[in-house]
């Protein structure tokens, strides 16, 4: 919330279109938060539901920041759209990395392991695993998610490995980063473009 207040104070110096984009981003963030709340502990959550949440929150904020930067820099509409798409793909990848870190990371990353699982958030690794598994294993996963505690980590990890969910999400991350980098092709060569490439690649490799 604080960062949005600061953002609006800075954005107020620019054209109305920048303020409108920031306002839309804030509204979508709130909508995404509400949608995520609706899907807490909801084992029927689909990948489409997941991406709707992410696009409203993380990816939407990234896209707004990137497109506003283009507008302020005086870029043409094609470049602005490319920057927006870069932000969307980068934001999706960033969130997927965050999902994996919640299941495999450590406290040194600034987020305790298992925060999302404890809160009942249906992240994509969990959604994928629940879709792939069948019979007893699917029932076991449902029981773990509905009655999660730290002593069930090994059970959960075993099922996620068996369903290939870790590798599936890692591949999706690579796909989103590749698409993000492709959206930069329209931009002229510059230090800024190289920095954006570096940021995209670095976000993909956060302690995975």
Residue ranges and their predicted role:
Residues 1-208:
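All-alpha prenyltransferase/terpene-synthase fold signal
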